[in-house]
């Protein structure tokens, strides 16, 4: 569970854990505004979005005619990292996720001051193994910084 996972990370040496769903909410709301301003008004025929840096790089390289249709909003990783850095300026932010492409994203000039390290789940699992930490064996810690629970009720809410 997320609470057990948080405890295991703290035993490993992390001081706090934030759920990246917060950043996903921030991005979804920003992209909804972008959609309402550009697509709904007819300025753009469609809007593409992806949290995957590999997808974004591929689209820009092989489909340059659609660059204006690719959302430039922050990815969940970056939005969450910026929130953490804003609240805790001296914090070192480590993103943990399934994809090694996030390492490329973290090396971008505009991101490298926000995300200090990226670990894949496989790498984190190896760290747990090396320290003989079993996340399932810990007590539940329910205090995980989670999603915003922001749910706009209508398109009008998105335009505000």
Language model: regions and residue ranges:
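Iron-sulfur-associated redox domains of electron-transfer enzymes in respiratory
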Residues: 1-160
